[in-house]
Design a protein with these regions (language model features):
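Sec-dependent N-terminal signal peptides of Gram-positive bacterial secreted proteins and lipoproteins
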Residues: 1-26
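Active-site histidine-acidic residue metal-binding/catalytic motifs
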Residues: 33-110, 136
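Structural recognition of the beta-strand scaffold that forms the well-ordered cores
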Residues: 49-53, 92-97, 120-125, 139-142, ...
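Solvent-exposed loop/turn segments at secondary-structure junctions
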Residues: 56-59, 99-103, 127-132, 145-148, ...
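A short, glycine/acidic-enriched catalytic loop
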Residues: 59-68, 129-161
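Long, well-ordered alpha-helical scaffolding segments within enzyme catalytic domains
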Residues: 77-82, 147-165, 204-228
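Mature extracellular/periplasmic domains of secretome proteins
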Residues: 105-119, 180-186
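Active-site-adjacent mobile loop/cap segments within catalytic or ligand-binding domains
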Residues: 124-128, 172-228
Length: 228
C-alpha cells in the first residue's frame, strides 16, 4: 500500500512540474509577443541615409542673388530637411555636420567620406552657378552610368518645382569629382543633387517659393516613403 501511495505522489509531483513548465513557457511566449522590444530585435534594420550640405567651413561655394551656396543650404534648406526627416518611419536619416565641408574633410584630413559606413547612402545637395543659355534648371549627378530609381525620383522633384537643366535632361555621370570618386571606390551609394542655379533669378525664385515642398519631396524621394 505504501508503494502505491509513493507512486501516486511521484506521478502527481511530475504532473505538477510538467504543468508549471508549460505554463511558464506560454507566459514567456505571450510576453515576447506583446513586448515591442523583443519584436524589434527580429525586425529588418532601417537603412541609413546621410544628407550633406555642399561646401561650408570657409568655402562659400557659388555666389548669387545676394547669398552663397553654403549659407543658403545650411540656413534655409537644412532646417526644412530636418523637419521632414523626422517623419519617416522605415529609414534612418542623419545629417553631416553642417559646420564642416565633407570635401575638405575627405581630401585634406582623410576623414569625411573615408569614415562613412559602406552600407550608408550619401545624398549631397548643391546649387549650380554660371551664365549662358544652359545656366538654369537642376539635375542629379549619379554614381552609376545609368540612373537608379532614387535618382529618377529626385530628378522628378527638380523638374516639378524648378525645371531640368537642358544640357543634362535630369542626370549626369561624372568621374572628375574627387570626393564622389572616394565614395565610388569604397562602394558607397550616392547621389549629388544640383537643385538649380543660384545665379539664375528665376531658378532661385522658384527654389525659395517651393522650398518646403522641395524638402518634403526630396525626403520622400530619398527614402521612398510617403510623408503625410
Amino acid at each position: 500500500m505504501k508503494k502505491i501511495i509513493a507512486i501516486v505522489i511521484t506521478c502527481l509531483t511530475l504532473s505538477a512540474i510538467l504543468i508549471a513548465g508549460l505554463t511558464y513557457k506560454q507566459t514567456v511566449l505571450a510576453s515576447q509577443q506583446s513586448d515591442p522590444t523583443v519584436a524589434n530585435q527580429s525586425a529588418k534594420p532601417k537603412h541609413h541615409y546621410l544628407l550633406v550640405m555642399g561646401h561650408g567651413a570657409g568655402d562659400p561655394g557659388a555666389h548669387g542673388n545676394g547669398t552663397t551656396e553654403a549659407h543658403f543650404l545650411r540656413a534655409k534648406f537644412l532646417p526644412k530637411l530636418r523637419k521632414y526627416a523626422k517623419e519617416v518611419k522605415n529609414s534612418r536619416v542623419t545629417f553631416y555636420n553642417p559646420k564642416h565641408d565633407i570635401v575638405r574633410d575627405t581630401l585634406v584630413f582623410h576623414k569625411g567620406s573615408y569614415k562613412i559606413n559602406k552600407k550608408t547612402t550619401v545624398i549631397m545637395f548643391h546649387l549650380d552657378a554660371g551664365g549662358g543659355a544652359y545656366a538654369h534648371g537642376g539635375h542629379v549627378i549619379i554614381h552609376r552610368p545609368t540612373p537608379i530609381k532614387r535618382d529618377r525620383r529626385l530628378a522628378h522633384v527638380i523638374k516639378k518645382y524648378v525645371g531640368l537643366n537642358p544640357a543634362y535632361h535630369g542626370y549626369s555621370y561624372r568621374t572628375n569629382l574627387r570626393n564622389c570618386n572616394v565614395l565610388r571606390r569604397r562602394g558607397i551609394d550616392y547621389s549629388l543633387v544640383e537643385m538649380g542655379f543660384i545665379t539664375n533669378k528665376h531658378d532661385f525664385k522658384k527654389i525659395n517659393q517651393h522650398l518646403d515642398q522641395i524638402a518634403k519631396n526630396d525626403i520622400e524621394a530619398i527614402t521612398h516613403e510617403t510623408i503625410k
